[in-house]
């Protein structure tokens, strides 16, 4: 609302100009009709030149501007951070950007391919799971895990074949999965590092993540700048190289304390969170609900770090690989997995006659993610857990105090002016009745 009022005042369209002129003229006529017959109380303190200046100020423009300013300050308490983020890129820019990692051509037709299901079937016996935990609010974290991509590329290089690849990040919810980042690569040279390809699709991101997420230098990891608690949960990275898929899961935990520079994220929106059935039917096309952001990796990362520091964040010295979660047997009963019989159960021997059946070995259970996934209500909005109210920062307290002070000062000023004018008019009316004269020259 404040931003709209500011735009209308700085660069108003013709219709708004006409309406403003009529409103200002009407206010001026009503004001001057009340006060024109009475010398204002400040007349003794100003000369005629000052009064001429005051009349220009009272033609409605200054009043309208003051009204906009006061209203904007009062209504900006909850929207100042979002407005600042919306226009910060136009005000400041990083001093320099790193050179591109490689040159490539973007072809839109590669976005027309349906997205394969991120839900893993019983053919996958081993999935790497990493643990990422933020130690404090407003922290920049990284989802990094090494893979066996190099061995696949060496195999392709020995066969002297180019390859195509696709990298997709998902946010796994209890009943669906939301793609948050997707890019396809074509005509790739296996002798070079992964993703150094001649052609690629549009770089697609979930819109709410563009200013707070970017790929790492090798384009395999994901960096999140000041994620909110609603970003906690399970993330899945799917790398597909010539039909072969590599899955990596990241269990992310963000503190519940409020971060003033974080955006709340809703990953459970049914328009983006797709069920296993939708993936299996080939109905998921990321082009329909993800936004384009075709910036090179280095430039995008520079922007994210710049905005993070601009908002008051502290950059980490270095990003480290996420800690691996060790497990002894294949996963079972995990979101995104079909029921898989435990290897231990399969190799179990029958008990000897006369002996009691020993207690069967329990299959390995993945760690529950219920405490990591925010609940969704009927309108699909994130419900934050009940926590102690955060301490109000000094900057917010000062801002609210100034806002209230300006609002009270404006109301008092308007009230005093109206009171003086009405009182002068009343005195003039009494004098007129006493003199029993139709007019009174002043």
Swiss-Prot record:
Q: Which residues are glycosylated?
A: 103, 111, 347, 396
Membrane-crossing residue ranges in chain numbering:
406-422
Q: Which InterPro entries match?
A: Herpes_glycop_dom, Ig-like_dom_sf
BP terms from Gene Ontology: entry receptor-mediated virion attachment to host cell; symbiont entry into host cell
Where does the record locate the signal sequence feature? 1-19
Q: Which Gene3D superfamilies match?
A: 2.70.230.10
- Which stretches does the entry tag as region Disordered? 331-364
Q: According to Swiss-Prot or TrEMBL, what is its membrane topology? A: Single-pass type I membrane protein
Topological domains on the Virion surface side lie at 20-405
Which UniProt keywords are listed?
Disulfide bond, Glycoprotein, Host-virus interaction, Membrane, Signal, Transmembrane, Transmembrane helix, Viral attachment to host cell, Viral attachment to host entry receptor, Viral envelope protein, Virion, Virus entry into host cell
The SS bond pairs are: 138-259, 176-273, 188-197
The protein's role, per its UniProt record? Envelope glycoprotein that binds to host cell entry receptors, promoting the virus entry into host cells. May trigger fusion with host membrane, by recruiting the fusion machinery composed of gB and gH/gL.
Question: Know the name of this protein?
Answer: Envelope glycoprotein D
**Species whose genome carries this gene:** Equine herpesvirus 1 (strain Kentucky A)
Lineage summary: Viruses, Duplodnaviria, Heunggongvirae, Peploviricota, Herviviricetes
